[in-house]
Structure formats: structure tokens, C-alpha cells
């Protein structure tokens, strides 16, 4: 059997829901399941940069790409600054190809702020938690959005919404993930749906 989600296996009559204790060890160390094993025994992830053929009961897995790192220590710092900026801009532009408005997620962090500024987006989307300023970045996101300037859409997640949707979020993730940003990502995606086109093409 193969699928894009583990949950696609669970209804199969021959599938056994058995805990993979080795994945549990990795989870307790890294807060997620690293590597190619999963929390389910005998269920594996397809490794990055791999594909497989399945024929006559046999699976043949092949690697199609290996990253190469060639050190060029003789280049000055200014060269690498320009290279990083060019690579970043190329990536942003590749993700902006659309015939509709483009938006981006925005927190108070440097990475999402840089993307929002460089991509010349039309909208930004932010969520925060309803427990004071410590875990709520909405005010900073709105401030940056005004400077760009673009319209910022935001949502404050209440404790009731957090715990009320936690089971659903875990269901979609297939495996335990001890990173609360998964909850924020779920809600910011739902916030996007309220202010963007429902068309599958968009």
C-alpha cells in the first residue's frame, strides 16, 4: 500500500495499527518523528529526492538527486550577500506566478517580514494567541503591513478555539508534532480562506 497520508491505510482490513517504539524515541528527543520511519510499525516515508517503481510485488526505490556543496572560500563577503539575495528573490518570484492577487503569512519574525516586503504582496495574514502580548504578534504584523503598505487580515485564537480544534489538527498531521506553530498555521490558513477566492484555480 502507498498513499500521501497514513490515514489512508487505517481502513484497510489488513492494516495493523501497531506503535513503532523507535519513532517514539526520536519524538521524545526532537519533538517530531525524524527520518523515514513513522509512529506506525511497517509504515515508512518516501525519502527526499527519491521515487519508486512497483511491479510484480516488488518495489524499486531510486534516488534522483544528491545535493552538492562546493566550497568557494576565495569569494568576498559581498559576493555571498549578493548571491543570497539573488537566490531569495528568484525563489520569491517563482512562487508569485499567478493571475490573481498574491498574499503571504506574516508574523513579527525576520523571515516572513522579508518575504512580505520583497514579494510585493497584496495582502498579509496573521494570527495570535489570546493570552497577552507574549504570544501575540498581530500588532507588529499590522505595523509592518502599514509600512509596506498592504492590507493585513488577522485573527486572535481563543483558548476554546485552540483546544476545540486540537484533535482535528492532530488528525490532519497524521503523527504527533510537539510544535504549537502547527495550530497557528491551521488558523492562519483558515483566515486566508475567508478573504481569498474559493476557486481551485486560485
Residue positions per predicted region:
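Substrate-binding/specificity loop regions of serine endopeptidase catalytic domains
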Residues: 179
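Hydrophobic pocket-lining residues that define ligand/cofactor binding sites across diverse proteins
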Residues: 192
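Conserved small/polar residues in nucleotide/adenosyl-binding loops
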Residues: 195-202
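Cysteine-centered catalytic environments shared across enzyme families
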Residues: 1-174, 185, 189
Amino acid at each position: 500500500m502507498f498513499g500521501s497520508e497514513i490515514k489512508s491505510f487505517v481502513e484497510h482490513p489488513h492494516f495493523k495499527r501497531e506503535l513503532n517504539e523507535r519513532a517514539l524515541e526520536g519524538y521524545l528527543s526532537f519533538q517530531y518523528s525524524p527520518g523515514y520511519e513513522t509512529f506506525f510499525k511497517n509504515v515508512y516515508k518516501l525519502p527526499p529526492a527519491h521515487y519508486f517503481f512497483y511491479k510484480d510485488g516488488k518495489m524499486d526505490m531510486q534516488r534522483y538527486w544528491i545535493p552538492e556543496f562546493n566550497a568557494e572560500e576565495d569569494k568576498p563577503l559581498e559576493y555571498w550577500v549578493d548571491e543570497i539575495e539573488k537566490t531569495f528573490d528568484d525563489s520569491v518570484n517563482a512562487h508569485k506566478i499567478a493571475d490573481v492577487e498574491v498574499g503571504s503569512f506574516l508574523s513579527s519574525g525576520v523571515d516572513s517580514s522579508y518575504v512580505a516586503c520583497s514579494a510585493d504582496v497584496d495582502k498579509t495574514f496573521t494570527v495570535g494567541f489570546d493570552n497577552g502580548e507574549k504570544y501575540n504578534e498581530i500588532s507588529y504584523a499590522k505595523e509592518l503591513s502599514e509600512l509596506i503598505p498592504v492590507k493585513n487580515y488577522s485573527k486572535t485564537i481563543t483558548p476554546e478555539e485552540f483546544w476545540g480544534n486540537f484533535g482535528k489538527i492532530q488528525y490532519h498531521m497524521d503523527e504527533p508534532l510537539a510544535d504549537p506553530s502547527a495550530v497557528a498555521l491551521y488558523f492562519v490558513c483558515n483566515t486566508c480562506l475567508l478573504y481569498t477566492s474559493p476557486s481551485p484555480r486560485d
